[in-house]
Amino acid sequence: QLVDALDGRRPSHVFCRGKLVAEEGRYLGSPYDGGLKFTNTMKLSYLSGPGDFRLKAPASQGETLVIYSKYDGPFNKAFYETLPVEDGYICIRQDPNLAMACVCNRHGLNQRTVVPIRNFGITEGAIATTVSHDCHNLTMIYRDPEDAWIAAETLKRSGGGIAVVLNGKVLASLALPAAGLMSQLSVDSLAPQVEQVEKAVYDLCAGKSSLLKMSTFALAAAGADYDG
């Protein structure tokens, strides 16, 4: 690399095997056309509808573990709360600071976990992503199970990625069909889609690091501490 400063953060020229491959931030070669590998990784046939994204309660007032999200920071605490129940399910409709978080295994184990989350910043709709370290399972934060179902179905069809849904409508989506993590498209083609997804997320969430928080939600090493 040829760089303008010793910190190396902005290379002006990049060479590979003696050949100039990038100049002033632009790749000079041809897009990869060798075909996609590691597709069809969305093994979610066990999901059957919006009911999969609701949390059953054993009694009229349901005590359940709630994840507390630090604003623009990591998930760091878990407490038990008694939440209202409607028709046998935990109801968050009357509390704008509550949402639901769901992690669905997409690698063939047919398992999912649903838990309330407080202070994430989302007040309506649903956000879903398969970029979720380290397991990269389908991870969703949502207020509406119907929107969560639509987001999950959108990513099943696209092979993974990110989807934002509000009132039954997909506001934005980014398809990442290679293992649910990568795209075969060029940076120039992807950039507008990424910007659209980021805008849609920001419109639904108060925090500006919502996607980053979601991408570490399923990381066991970053799990919430239980404060009983």
Task: Label each residue range with its predicted role.
Residues 1-228:
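Active-site microenvironment of metallo-dependent hydrolases
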